[in-house]
Amino acid sequence: MVLMGPHSALRLLPLKTQAIRFVLLLLLSVLILAVALLVTNARMPDPKVVRPLPDIGFEVFPKVGWLEHLTDVCIFILNFLSLLVVFKLYLLHRQNEGLDELQPFSCCPLIGKIIFGVWDSGRQSGIEKRDAHLIAWIRYFTTYFIVLLFRAIVVVMTSYPATDNHCQNPMKITNPVKNVIMTLVTFGSGSIHCGDLMFSGHTVSITLSLLVQWIYGSMLHWVFRPASVLLVLLSFYSIIASRSHYTDDILVSFYITVTTFLVLRHSPDGAPWQLQLLIGWWPCCVSNEETEDSDRNPTFVAVEVFLPHGDYQCAERISEEKTTVGPACGNFGHW
């Protein structure tokens, strides 16, 4: 008997389609959050009346205002490393599929080897190399848009007193539309917003980069794990020391992001079918049908069928298109 899941009758979207459409869904969640920030900025308690909340992190680490810029630098480096991991996973995928190595810098082999060289740590992570770059990308953006939507609700519900930073003298938003656009374009760094404390948006981005480098970066090189941990710790210190967020903002954000990312497990189908329903009806932004892909070679798939008398029959077939019937048992235990 073959177990049939609720998604077995659904046509799952190609990974490349998911990779593009979930980016657009993230932008939509940023737009919703930008509107929510207008509300939080207006509802924030008057700093002249309500002082910052007691915080052990503030008591342990002295205030160093300029460290707010160091936080941005750390986030930039972490994001760059995450992009590097995804690109190197793509090169590893190509090697695993038996495709030729990319050699765009034939005139300078050293540069070509550094940029387009294949990295493989040899670590047995239980994650297949095939399409790992697309799946990592999809997990990143699906987690990001879910957490930001949740944050848009949370920051509106309860207004916390401003921390001891520039929000003690908050700027007034004179042009809400412009502020929303600046939030969307700069992901918040170029817009006016105070009061969006519970929970930290900076920490969402930082934690996602940590997860990508811890889980997928370790498939490429051992250095990604210690490097990302050091950058994350430095980022958290900078956020607290610059008084950008309360310590609880960081702890709650870290927990929510990690939990969401781990729930959205690594799957050869990409995002869970429930999330694919959000983008499966779109008439634009890449086809809903799997097309012939030069990065794919025919593979043998073993299908185990339970017969009435307890015997087992194993059939092999060549498949150019992946379909999943029932739960993907091989994914249990993967990060």
Swiss-Prot record:
Main localization, broad class: membrane
Enzyme class: transferase
Transmembrane segments: 22-42, 73-93, 99-119, 140-160, 180-200, 204-224
Keyword terms: Kinase, Lipid metabolism, Membrane, Sphingolipid metabolism, Transferase, Transmembrane, Transmembrane helix
Enzyme Commission number: 2.7.8.-
Membrane topology (Extracellular): 43-72, 120-139, 201-203
Pfam families, alphabetized: PAP2_C (PF14360)
Subcellular location: Membrane
CC terms in the record's Gene Ontology section: endoplasmic reticulum membrane; Golgi membrane; plasma membrane
Bilayer topology annotation: Multi-pass membrane protein
UniProt GO molecular function: ceramide cholinephosphotransferase activity; kinase activity; sphingomyelin synthase activity
GO biological process: ceramide biosynthetic process
Keyword Membrane in record: yes
Coiled-coil regions, chain positions: none
Top-level taxon of the source organism: Eukaryota
Function of the molecule: Bidirectional lipid inositolphosphotransferase capable of converting phosphatidylinositol (PI) and ceramide to inositol-phosphorylceramide (IPC) and diacylglycerol (DAG) and vice versa. Direction is dependent on the relative concentrations of DAG and ceramide as phosphoinositol acceptors. Essential for viability of the pathogenic bloodstream stage of this human protozoan parasite and, consequently, can be considered as potential drug target.
Assigned protein family: Belongs to the sphingomyelin synthase family.
Entry protein name: Phosphatidylinositol:ceramide inositolphosphotransferase
